[in-house]
Amino acid sequence: MGLPEVMPASVLRGQLLLFVLLLLGPQISQGLVITPPGPEFVLNISSTFVLTCSSSAPVMWEQMSQVPWQEAAMNQDGTFSSVLTLTNVTGGDTGEYFCVYNNSLGPELSERKRIYIFVPDPTMGFLPMDSEDLFIFVTDVTETTIPCRVTDPQLEVTLHEKKVDIPLHVPYDHQRGFIGTFEDKTYICKTTIGDREVDSDTYYVYSLQVSSINVSVNAVQTVVRQGESITIRCIVMGNDVVNFQWTYPRMKSGRLVEPVTDYLFGVPSRIGSILHIPTAELSDSGTYTCNVSVSVNDHGDEKAINVTVIENGYVRLLETLEDVQIAELHRSRTLQVVFEAYPTPSVLWFKDNRTLGDSSAGELVLSTRNVSETRYVSELTLVRVKVSEAGYYTMRAFHADDQVQLSFKLQVNVPVRVLELSESHPANGEQILRCRGRGMPQPNVTWSTCRDLKRCPRKLSPTPLGNSSKEESQLETNVTFWEEDQEYEVVSTLRLRHVDQPLSVRCMLQNSMGRDSQEVTVVPHSLPFKVVVISAILALVVLTVISLIILIMLWQRKPRYEIRWKVIESVSSDGHEYIYVDPVQLPYDSTWELPRDQLVLGRTLGSGAFGQVVEATAHGLSHSQATMKVAVKMLKSTARSSEKQALMSELKIMSHLGPHLNVVNLLGACTKGGPIYIITEYCRYGDLVDYLHRNKHTFLQRHSNKHCPPSTELYSNALPVGLSLPSHLNLTGESDGGYMDMSKDESVDYVPMLDMKGHIKYADIESSSYMAPYDNYVPSAPERTYRATLINDSPVLSYTDLVGFSYQVANGMEFLASKNCVHRDLAARNVLICEGKLVKICDFGLARDIMRDSNYISKGSTFLPLKWMAPESIFNSLYTTLSDVWSFGILLWEIFTLGGTPYPELPMNDQFYNAIKRGYRMAQPAHASDEIYEIMQKCWEEKFETRPPFSQLVLLLERLLGEGYKKKYQQVDEEFLRSDHPAILRSQARLPGLHSLRSPLDTSSVLYTAVQPNETDNDYIIPLPDPKPDAADEGLLEGSPSLASSTLNEVNTSSTISCDSPLELQEEPQAEPEAQLEQPQDSGCPGPLAEAEDSFL
């Protein structure tokens, strides 16, 4: 006997409701009835009022979602009623009352009726509100209600902003309040009871941005093992107030999980709900649903996600690979294995049972990436596959719960290549051809022949060769697989029994990677060796031609002689375009000619790559002296025509320059009947660098006392004022002395001039040695006849001498700058020392082997003195008188280091160039005063426009000298200008007003301004008629009086203007010498150089 089945209470309630509806269905249709009827009632305070609600079904009264005390009954006629008695009513009883069906009958009966009751209460103007009802949230732009309700419907109510006392015109309903569209502000309601004004509570209106619900649900892991945690996030974007409701498997068993709400403020804002189960069970597998709804409206959305709880982890292959994988040689190959696993596995790759890892050279790359939650892709990438990488590979993925592995063989296909094709000639007359090649996969061998294999494909196919039934050929092929190299080797041997004419035979190997072939020509044994002989002859001819080409190129790259100095004729208005005097077109004044029979050549003073300087004795140059020792510039017999033209250009320029005390002056020239000779002054003590080296010990002994700094020494002349020296300041006397520290060319053979014209004389001139001490010099008898003032005849090198050398060089450079002359090689090696410590500026590049001189760096067809060059000259090929100022600063450094080499700490490479670009400057020399070093620094200004001109440098150095030295220098200069020096006499013949040209201490006439091209500038070159040259040198002396200057091209500027003497100004009338003094001389051009040699950087 079974027990009765127990039914749930909800089922019994539903059956009861169905039974009541079936019985009372017709009566329910009559609806709810309220007694007394009416939409609203106004009750007196403290009165009693009874309300009855009746219907065919059980009913009840509600007020503000609350159920007041009431009396329910079932009438005799079968209807139901509920009586609500309001006793001793007050203003607080004002409000809505609803008659509804009893909730126990279910939601099917949702009808209700409403009645509103007012209880006017003088003490209560407005009904009290709960605090949460004072905050009114508005979504979008919709109407809303401010519920300031009164107890008396007869009262007049107004609405105000709290901060403004002006009433708002908004409709008012006594039962509901003010209805309208409101801004986000604070509002208050006002009414008047009797003579008393009553204010309501303050209402706050807020607008909420409620966008469409966009829900996203994600889980940290959708697959978890039992015992691990489950975390699911439900996120809503852009909504401020939402409600979350979760549905998940545990709810069926009544085990609830409390979600956690997470607010992430930002733009846009995010609100999230997190459902966390710390310990997952197998029963937690299933669907997790997140339902989101907006609090202020009925919008909503929901999303679901499936979570799987497993007992143990797993690893499963999703794709398999073929057992043999193919890779091509020297091409990258990626091998990919796809599998699924949880938790994350470890992955290893093996080759031939050896573990693989990433190659440091990047030739092998291993990677495993997670493409989804449980899906993985592991890749093996071989970069530029090699033959050695062929073999057996295995991928193994594993973790503590499971593992899986996949193996395959990698075959590297190698293109076929013919390694060897040889022939042999056995004694039996056969021709044996052996072809050996390799490849992977196995290559096939094909032999073919033709009279000319290159033409065969055009007309007919080559004839295949193989085993012949006529026994004309026999073929044998052997195939071997090399395990180490993982490729096949094929050796094929072809025997040709009868070859009576030349044949071209091809061996071709082919596989899936391509083909390769070689050809060989098979000739009969009787073929002559004519081809071999012809080939050898052709090879010798080709080698001879190549050797000649190389020799010609080396000859053309040999550096050419060029004069360094340039004379600027005019500058463009913007300072970036220059026009230089073209020395080729200048005329030559024949008054400088000296007959060759009046010149006796002596020993070589200096020899260079292009020419030499020879000591000589000249007759008839001076009225006061029968003979004069001079220096003669000449080219070597191997000089090219361009170098002869450069020397002639130098002579033409020098013939138009005026004399100066501190410049090596031109005395004469020989241009007819033989080589070109330029005759200049002779300086017995050589160049300044060597002079400083020879006399350094006297300076150091003099200044060994540290308490007596050089800058404090007092200058005094050791000789009395009346002591004289030979005419022309003994510059041309027959005295001993050295010349320049240059390489002596003792092997120079002089071509006797008598062989050419029969007029030149040679003599053994007394040898001079500048190694002799300064004080050992004893003037000869003729020299003692004429004595003049000496600047200094002391044998000891003093600090004043160093400053005096600097001062004299600055005076000479000031003179050159006033003639718009740019030196471009100002250095101590180009400054000579004469008697009385007089210095003269020169350019003896002709007599210096610059190709072996470390001070000159080769660039194309020229050599450049980089250590003395300004930055704009090094990097931009810009040469101006202000770039000479930079070189003057380097010369000062040489003087006060007693002949030191500039930049001793910098090698001549990129380090030197980078240091100059960064603004590196040499340190103060040990023997230089602060004033001298300050002058150096001014000369080394980065911007050449800010460097001082030579006129200013003369004044700066003059301040450092004593009055005695300046008087002696001025006296020597005046005596020089009044003497019968050949340079003075010949210049006076052309320019009568020479003595009034310049005072040695007057520097105001030199102005460093741009020379504007005008007719006056062009007029200073006087087109004098040239002497008729001999046929041998006719081309060098040609110079037409066309334009006095031209913009120089590369050919014209290859020889710069030598400033052994400065350029002379145009002759002016004898009656106006003072006007010439007042006219300022332009000093050069600070703008960029428009031409000249290319920058060597």
Curated annotation (Swiss-Prot):
<dbReference type="GO" id="GO:0048146">
    <property type="term" value="P:positive regulation of fibroblast proliferation"/>
</dbReference>
<dbReference type="InterPro" id="IPR036179">
    <property type="entry name" value="Ig-like_dom_sf"/>
</dbReference>
<dbReference type="GO" id="GO:0048745">
    <property type="term" value="P:smooth muscle tissue development"/>
</dbReference>
<dbReference type="GO" id="GO:0004672">
    <property type="term" value="F:protein kinase activity"/>
</dbReference>
<feature type="binding site">
    <location>
        <position position="633"/>
    </location>
    <ligand>
        <name>ATP</name>
    </ligand>
</feature>
<feature type="modified residue" description="Phosphotyrosine; by ABL1 and ABL2">
    <location>
        <position position="933"/>
    </location>
</feature>
<dbReference type="InterPro" id="IPR001245">
    <property type="entry name" value="Ser-Thr/Tyr_kinase_cat_dom"/>
</dbReference>
<feature type="glycosylation site" description="N-linked (GlcNAc...) asparagine">
    <location>
        <position position="102"/>
    </location>
</feature>
<dbReference type="GO" id="GO:0019899">
    <property type="term" value="F:enzyme binding"/>
</dbReference>
<dbReference type="GO" id="GO:0035909">
    <property type="term" value="P:aorta morphogenesis"/>
</dbReference>
<feature type="binding site">
    <location>
        <begin position="605"/>
        <end position="613"/>
    </location>
    <ligand>
        <name>ATP</name>
    </ligand>
</feature>
<keyword id="KW-0812">Transmembrane</keyword>
<dbReference type="GO" id="GO:0035441">
    <property type="term" value="P:cell migration involved in vasculogenesis"/>
</dbReference>
<dbReference type="InterPro" id="IPR013151">
    <property type="entry name" value="Immunoglobulin_dom"/>
</dbReference>
<dbReference type="GO" id="GO:0034405">
    <property type="term" value="P:response to fluid shear stress"/>
</dbReference>
<feature type="domain" description="Ig-like C2-type 3">
    <location>
        <begin position="213"/>
        <end position="308"/>
    </location>
</feature>
<dbReference type="GO" id="GO:2000491">
    <property type="term" value="P:positive regulation of hepatic stellate cell activation"/>
</dbReference>
<feature type="glycosylation site" description="N-linked (GlcNAc...) asparagine">
    <location>
        <position position="444"/>
    </location>
</feature>
<feature type="domain" description="Ig-like C2-type 4">
    <location>
        <begin position="415"/>
        <end position="523"/>
    </location>
</feature>
<dbReference type="GO" id="GO:0048407">
    <property type="term" value="F:platelet-derived growth factor binding"/>
</dbReference>
<feature type="glycosylation site" description="N-linked (GlcNAc...) asparagine">
    <location>
        <position position="44"/>
    </location>
</feature>
<dbReference type="GO" id="GO:2000379">
    <property type="term" value="P:positive regulation of reactive oxygen species metabolic process"/>
</dbReference>
<feature type="modified residue" description="Phosphotyrosine; by autocatalysis">
    <location>
        <position position="715"/>
    </location>
</feature>
<dbReference type="GO" id="GO:0043627">
    <property type="term" value="P:response to estrogen"/>
</dbReference>
<dbReference type="GO" id="GO:0009986">
    <property type="term" value="C:cell surface"/>
</dbReference>
<feature type="region of interest" description="Disordered">
    <location>
        <begin position="1016"/>
        <end position="1097"/>
    </location>
</feature>
<feature type="modified residue" description="Phosphotyrosine; by autocatalysis">
    <location>
        <position position="770"/>
    </location>
</feature>
<keyword id="KW-1015">Disulfide bond</keyword>
<dbReference type="GO" id="GO:0016020">
    <property type="term" value="C:membrane"/>
</dbReference>
<dbReference type="InterPro" id="IPR017441">
    <property type="entry name" value="Protein_kinase_ATP_BS"/>
</dbReference>
<feature type="signal peptide">
    <location>
        <begin position="1"/>
        <end position="31"/>
    </location>
</feature>
<dbReference type="GO" id="GO:0051897">
    <property type="term" value="P:positive regulation of phosphatidylinositol 3-kinase/protein kinase B signal transduction"/>
</dbReference>
<keyword id="KW-0547">Nucleotide-binding</keyword>
<dbReference type="Pfam" id="PF00047">
    <property type="entry name" value="ig"/>
</dbReference>
<dbReference type="GO" id="GO:0038085">
    <property type="term" value="F:vascular endothelial growth factor binding"/>
</dbReference>
<feature type="modified residue" description="Phosphotyrosine; by ABL1 and ABL2">
    <location>
        <position position="969"/>
    </location>
</feature>
<feature type="topological domain" description="Extracellular">
    <location>
        <begin position="32"/>
        <end position="531"/>
    </location>
</feature>
<comment type="similarity">
    <text>Belongs to the protein kinase superfamily. Tyr protein kinase family. CSF-1/PDGF receptor subfamily.</text>
</comment>
<keyword id="KW-0472">Membrane</keyword>
<dbReference type="GO" id="GO:0009636">
    <property type="term" value="P:response to toxic substance"/>
</dbReference>
<keyword id="KW-0217">Developmental protein</keyword>
<feature type="glycosylation site" description="N-linked (GlcNAc...) asparagine">
    <location>
        <position position="214"/>
    </location>
</feature>
